[in-house]
């Protein structure tokens, strides 16, 4: 569990190290606000994305299921600045095992609420789905803008990073993978 008191002290000291007066009017509550914000933003640290699949059903459905444009935000573990974008998840049920659609979005939410790398986030979402449903195929695509590339360093706002993970049928069969990509990219 996060230690809010310890976080507040560290933020207070950080403000001092910047040369600021943490006791001035505009900053006196900042350590508390920032600590509470980080506790919320990193709330996925003590959760498992796989545990979000609480509703698994046996249906007579053997065709692809796609949930796309799932908005998310996360924090780059290298610079502790946000990256945000959309996740797209496709899976081909195995023996008719399907899940509630919101469970896919919840898995993204939990996996993204921690210091993270986009590549790892993509893999964690795919692994959670594989563990929960054991589908015939999984395809996860995440596209995001990273503030560490927008606000600092190279300063290229609007640039997007795309990561994918393909498993099962979507890894082994190039035609099937192309079909999923085409469906995801349709407006």
Swiss-Prot record:
It holds the Pfam family GTP_cyclohydroI. Gene3D superfamilies: 1.10.286.10, 3.30.1130.10. This is GTP cyclohydrolase 1. One of its GO terms (cellular component) is cytoplasm. It catalyses: GTP + H2O = 7,8-dihydroneopterin 3'-triphosphate + formate + H(+). Toroid-shaped homodecamer, composed of two pentamers of five dimers. One of its GO terms (biological process) is tetrahydrofolate biosynthetic process. The gene is folE. Zn(2+) binds at residues 76, 79, 148. Belongs to the GTP cyclohydrolase I family. Pathway: Cofactor biosynthesis; 7,8-dihydroneopterin triphosphate biosynthesis; 7,8-dihydroneopterin triphosphate from GTP: step 1/1. Its EC number is 3.5.4.16. GO terms for molecular function: GTP binding; GTP cyclohydrolase I activity; zinc ion binding. Signal peptide: none annotated.
């Amino acid at each position: 569990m996060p230690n809010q008191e310890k976080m507040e002290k560290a933020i207070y000291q950080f403000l001092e190290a910047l040369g600021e007066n943490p006791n001035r009017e505009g900053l006196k509550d900042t350590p508390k606000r920032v600590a509470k914000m980080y506790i919320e933003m990193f709330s996925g640290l003590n959760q498992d994305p796989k545990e979000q699949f609480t509703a698994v059903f046996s249906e007579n459905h053997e065709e692809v299921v796609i949930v796309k444009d799932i908005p998310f935000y996360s924090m780059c573990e290298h610079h502790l600045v946000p990256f945000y974008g959309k996740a797209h998840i496709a899976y081909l049920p195995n023996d008719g095992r399907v899940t509630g659609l919101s469970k896919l979005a919840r898995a993204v939410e939990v996996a993204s609420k921690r210091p993270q790398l986009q590549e790892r986030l993509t893999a964690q979402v795919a692994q959670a789905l594989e563990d929960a449903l054991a589908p015939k195929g999984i395809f996860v695509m995440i596209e995001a803008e990273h503030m560490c590339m927008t606000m600092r360093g190279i300063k290229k706002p609007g640039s997007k990073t795309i990561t994918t993970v393909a498993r099962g049928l979507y890894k082994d069969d190039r035609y099937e993978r192309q079909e999923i990509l085409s469906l995801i990219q349709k407006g």
